[in-house]
């Protein structure tokens, strides 16, 4: 097992990474749990891992109840959030009841937002079961639900008490979900660590085969990079925005196609290539770097191009992006592979040229 600590102005917390951790969850998480816990999961994850977690909490003497939600990005909304609140209130959850998010990024984001707002703040723990959530969404305290006009538009910064990433849970992931998570892994190398990017180029077949040693190394490095960035910029006033590489274009794809039609990681993959193409238009990164990024994404089974839709729709979706400031769109681009840069775009003709093959 590998452990690292996230340090933020609000508080610090551990991330546990390894195999076979879920059966040990009671003992590992006991210092971060109250006397009672609410396990919140979905219909897909519950049959796989809920029983194991319940047994682990029983062994640690932690009482608990469970709330099981529908699965999928299409349910990341007010209606499903209210199901969490219904379950908490029906089970008389108190402010010190610990909410445990058992699932992927959708569960983690919604449970975190529920924790941030239930009785004005209850503790919560992340137990991510997808690659995307283990390397990205479970760490750093971003919580949210979607709005029909934009992804993650309603939310809060609210840090968990702990994160437990059991890599064994990745063996039950569908291949498409594994690839989607790998988009975020590749993103880290592209935005801030060319050495890691090169390592990914060399080890992608082993990673996709879930070989234990390289997988542990990759998840640890991603969490380490995110922890370092979040420690410097908890509420995304500066460099934390780098972590949104590919997301401005990607969120537009998700909103246009309908949440869940393209998986988040698939949309981010296409978005990363578009961000590199935009950087080319601005005279920053090279066509060779863009091609190299696209090739690595494709090696992970990911799309390197977005679906086709009208430029006006791209602009409409991107105008709702959370990085827009003073009406000016801000994109995360690349000076070169391994070096992200925040770019303000006032000339939409540059965006049109970037997107021209997909209009």
From Swiss-Prot:
UniProt subcellular location: Cytoplasm
Cofactor binding mode and count: Binds 1 divalent metal cation per subunit. Can use either Co(2+) or Zn(2+).
Gene3D superfamilies reported for this sequence: 3.40.50.1970, Dehydroquinate synthase-like - alpha domain
E.C. number(s) listed in UniProt: 4.2.3.4
Keyword Cytoplasm: yes
Entry-linked SUPFAM superfamilies: Dehydroquinate synthase-like
Record has Magnesium as a keyword: no
One GO term of the biological process aspect: chorismate biosynthetic process
Catalysis performed (reactions): 7-phospho-2-dehydro-3-deoxy-D-arabino-heptonate = 3-dehydroquinate + phosphate
Positions bound to NAD(+): 71-76, 105-109, 129-130, 142, 151, 169-172
Pathway as given in its UniProt record: Metabolic intermediate biosynthesis; chorismate biosynthesis; chorismate from D-erythrose 4-phosphate and phosphoenolpyruvate: step 2/7
GO cellular component term of the entry, any: cytoplasm
Recorded superkingdom: Bacteria
Entry cofactors: Co(2+); Zn(2+); NAD(+)
One Pfam family this sequence matches: DHQS_C
UniProt entry keywords in alphabetical sequence: Amino-acid biosynthesis, Aromatic amino acid biosynthesis, Cobalt, Cytoplasm, Lyase, Metal-binding, NAD, Nucleotide-binding, Zinc
Binding of Zn(2+), residues: 184, 247, 264
Disulfide feature: none
Similarity comment text for this entry: Belongs to the sugar phosphate cyclases superfamily. Dehydroquinate synthase family.
Stated role: Catalyzes the conversion of 3-deoxy-D-arabino-heptulosonate 7-phosphate (DAHP) to dehydroquinate (DHQ).
Name used for this protein in its record: 3-dehydroquinate synthase
Native source organism of the sequence: Neisseria gonorrhoeae (strain ATCC 700825 / FA 1090)
Gene: aroB
